[in-house]
């Protein structure tokens, strides 16, 4: 089921910056936010508790990639935190992903990273020695994630249709690298607008700097939300 709220990437160095940012939103505006490595490693589980107390939904973006036993144990800890969504690297393999599913349980959405949106096909071939096309590699990872019992994948909007054709229509596709119409691309190499992502079938979108660096974050958020839901 499509999430109507764009997920806001809280790419900040600490809690004070997060608080200053969230103060620009109405207190009753319940957001869906992404906590990544920088913020989580700086603040620890306390930042999750703070955001939950504010009533926000949380995608904890740590991209776990380790041996199955370690990942399963880590996921048990994340399950106790009560996050709404988290992820692993599909490159860790089916057994690792199955272990992640066991550890997290069924109450939270578990997705796998296929290829980072900053990765080009040339980089994939040179750095990872994967000689298929980028799209073929992404679809393969998505199929392995589905086999492992995950709910979906992180992928570029350019691959959503291919992934759903290769898996199922209810296999979740979360799309980062979203930029509003007319926005700067930044360091993302495979990007789309919110409307494009909606039309192509994305279930979740993640938006960071266009909102967090905006002079008027709440108005920008509402504009992106409207474009996403109108798409």
UniProtKB/Swiss-Prot annotation:
Keywords: Decarboxylase, Lyase, Pyrimidine biosynthesis. One of its GO terms (cellular component) is cytosol. Signal peptide: none annotated. SMART domains: OMPdecase (SM00934). Its EC number is 4.1.1.23. The active site is at residue 63. Pathway: Pyrimidine metabolism; UMP biosynthesis via de novo pathway; UMP from orotate: step 2/2. Pfam families: OMPdecase. InterPro entries: Aldolase_TIM, OMPdecase, OMPdecase_AS, OMPdecase_bac, OMPdeCOase_dom, RibuloseP-bd_barrel. It is an enzyme of class 4 (lyase). The keyword Protein transport does not apply. It catalyses: orotidine 5'-phosphate + H(+) = UMP + CO2. Coiled coil: none annotated. It comes from the Bacteria. One of its GO terms (molecular function) is orotidine-5'-phosphate decarboxylase activity. Substrate binds at residues 11, 34, 61-70, 117, 179, 188, 208-209. PROSITE patterns: OMPDECASE. Catalyzes the decarboxylation of orotidine 5'-monophosphate (OMP) to uridine 5'-monophosphate (UMP). Belongs to the OMP decarboxylase family. Type 1 subfamily. Homodimer. NCBIfam families: PRK00230.1 (NF001273), pyrF (TIGR01740). This is Orotidine 5'-phosphate decarboxylase. It comes from Streptococcus suis (strain 05ZYH33). The gene is pyrF.
